[in-house]
Amino acid sequence: MEYQNTDHTFAVCAYKESPYLESCIKSLVNQKVKSNIIVCTSTPCEVIENMAKKYDIPYYVREGKSDICDDWNFSVACTKTNYVTVAHQDDVYNEHYVEELLKHIPDEKMSIFIADYLPLKGGKAGKRDI
């Protein structure tokens, strides 16, 4: 079976007025291979709602106390695809992320896809801090 970009969703978990949210969303919108994107929050505010509207992204609000475990599970439950990347509001993805992910989905041994990272400091990629 060949997997398509429509088999995957980025579920962005957003909290309050994050200054990084738009950078995260732009990195998802600018993927070379397009994918579904949703924004989820347990701390609704105009900043998050307006950002979702600006990029025409479905927006979901979880009721109850903000809790990262429950929030991430909620974001996965809001998707309609078999493959989900939970993206935190301060994550920025390489433009080839979805392209590379789709290459590895057919591997039956793969149950989780982990990508490398570089921390951004002052808008520039820095050295790994762990």
Give a label for each model feature.
Residues M1-S27:
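N-proximal low-complexity "stem/linker" segments adjacent to membrane-targeting elements
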Residues C40-E49:
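A conserved acidic beta->alpha catalytic loop
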Residues E63-T79:
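Glycine-rich, basic loop-to-helix element that forms the pyrophosphate-binding segment
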Residues V98-D129:
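Conserved donor NDP-sugar-binding/catalytic core segment of glycosyltransferases
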Residues K26-S35:
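Short, acidic, metal-binding catalytic loop of nucleotide-sugar glycosyltransferases
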Residues H88-V92:
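The conserved acidic donor/metal-binding loop of glycosyltransferases
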